[in-house]
Amino acid sequence: MPEPEARFMTMALDCVQREYPNKISHVLASDADAQTPRELHPAFYGCFDWHSSVHGHWMLVRLLRTMPDNALTQAATAALDANLTLENMAGEVAYFAAEGRAAFERPYGLAWLLQLGAELREWDDPRAQRWSAAIAPLERTVSDRYRSWLPNLAYPIRIGTHNQSAFALALGLDWAREAGDVELESLIVTKAMGFHAEDRNCPIGYEPSGEDFLSPCLMEADLMRRVMPAADYLAWLDAFLPDIPRNGSADWLVPGIVLDASDGKLVHLDGVNLSRAWALEGIAAALPPEDTRRASLLAAAAVHEEVGTESVNGEDYAGGHWLASFATYLVTRRGLQAPAWRALPEESLPE
């Protein structure tokens, strides 16, 4: 197994069954709700928090799928077999169903759970089929949360951290298309167009903020390539990011700087470098080969990838519990495999 992927898998194995330290996002309705992470979340109790545990499991699946028969295959399979069981998922579903938890992990953790589901659905392997069947009840719960949330979301959430809506819409859309959930696909496409079709002059020069791990501008552009026909997307991108260079330069977008990698908030900027890189590649992939912006998009992506992957070293758990998932999404080109835009039947569109 090549570097750095072996390092990433090792980092996932080091955290998916590591209960502490742990930051729980938990509403207590009574004394009985004061429980340990493993009691609250029988499957996703590791990796410091619920969403990181979910994408840690996704990372193991992704690396098993893209790099089979590596030295860590047995350990990764055993960890997934232990955690992704019907019994454990029943506990996760019960947690979601309890009073006061309608907004639990919305939307970031929900998006990663659907990404895990999409990965398992795509992989033609007996292990994937076993794990996919196990998480199916939680998949249904989470996709239903999207359905109840999006009609009531009046405005996009344009921030660079967990609550950002563009990232969650993109991953949710990828799952809906893979799962054949036309209702959710239509809802996400309609909401994305309503939020963003008229957006202009995104202020990317103001990015990043001091604790970002997602670029508001680039994640929106990465979403919209999924929901617009190619010609429409070209015109939209011209207006949305009009200053992308056409000379092949990379210096138009400078990577984020982390001065203290032991600070759980400040280390977010290592993540923004990784997620910027995959978004830049996604935007470039949506442009025709002759588009002169492609070179500058890919040059900036390469710089961000180099800086970002170097930061994924596991030296501190503040970044070690999650950065490898971002790096895996990037280096395995997961985003470039997103199901393509397609015209939806009119009867499927929300009124």
Language-model-detected regions and their locations in the chain:
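Extended ligand-binding groove/face enriched in aromatic
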Residues: 54, 63-176
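Terminal, non-catalytic domain-edge segments
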Residues: 1-15, 22, 66, 123-126, ...
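Low-complexity, Ser/Thr/Pro/Gly-enriched N-terminal "stalk/linker" regions
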Residues: 1-45
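Active-site-adjacent bridging/hinge elements
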Residues: 26-35, 88-89, 141-147, 196, ...
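Solvent-exposed loop and edge beta-strand segments that line ligand/cofactor-binding
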Residues: 1, 38-54, 94-110, 152-165, ...
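Loop-centered beta-sheet repeat module
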Residues: 145-220
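Well-ordered alpha-helical segments within folded domains of soluble proteins
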Residues: 52-63, 106-121, 163-177, 212-226, ...
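HEAT/HEAT-like alpha-solenoid repeats
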Residues: 10-13, 17, 21, 42-46, ...
